[in-house]
Amino acid sequence: FSSGAFESKRPTSKILKAYIEEVENDCVTNAIVRADLNFEYLNFEKFYTIEECVIRSVSPFNAHQSGGKLAKLPGDELILTTGDFRAYEKPQDMNSKFGKILKINLNTGIDEIISIGHRNPQGLFLSDNMEYLLISEHGPKGGDEINIVNLKKVQNYGWPISSYGTHYDGGTRTEAPLYKSHESYGFVEPAWYFEYEQNDLHGISAIEKDYSLGGNNYLIATLKGNIIYEVEIDFNNSEVINISPMKVGARVRDIEYDIDNDFYYLIMENTPSIGILTKNNK
């Protein structure tokens, strides 16, 4: 499992989980299962599967880059992020569901492409006005991005044509040139990105609202950086206004707010453990 969501806040809600499924021998895809919310037993049933699959190749750096983050939209719609599984041709192909942000109808299972040109989006949060998605996305070596996705129009975020990172082996690839501009090639520039020189700070993995500050303030967790960033967003201009690091000393895979206790759960994968983050307002 890579991510989860609830269909609603009602006690009778269903829980949804995204995962990677091997649909054919050595061929994988994104899928979603769901179950009635039950604290004794969860009986998951298949809800959604991307029909195409990508053949896994064994290589020195076997990156899966699968996306798999879920977020509930108002009404009967769900957001699913997908990665490219290192199939560079997929993110720019409108006939493929890989390297995309998808909107899925919870009643019919029919999907719709929201944005294209993504590598591995694994942080996802819906803005307060419900018009934008805030996305954190793993780059290659460097080039991690914070992107703002407008839900009202399909836009292209450039991967693998444009990226501010480099390939892990330092080489070049015709199918993935990683040009150091998005706008020059007709793509949306990231609201924020981390260059190779900042590589020790990146690995952005999850997003949660910063409820202590309110407004458009968020907490963005990292893996390699062992940092949580406090970030202020201007959605109308697709900009990061302020960003400041907070050292936590662990790879934070996920961060979730507990409204009843007014603190955050940190899922720290290298310990492994669950941490608690509280805000000191003194």
Predicted regions and their residues:
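Hydrophobic transmembrane alpha-helix bundles
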Residues: 50-62, 147-155, 174, 251-258
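Conserved blade-ending motifs and adjacent loop-strand segments that build the rim/top face
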Residues: 238-259
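Basic side chains
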Residues: 34, 69, 100-103, 119, ...
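Surface loop/turn motifs at the tips and blade-to-blade linkers of beta-strand repeat domains
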Residues: 48-52, 58-62, 112-117, 194-196, ...
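Acidic, Gly/Ser/Thr-rich repeat motifs that build Ca2+-stabilized beta-propeller blades
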Residues: 1-87, 123-139, 197-236, 259-281
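Beta-propeller domain segments
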Residues: 4, 11, 84-241
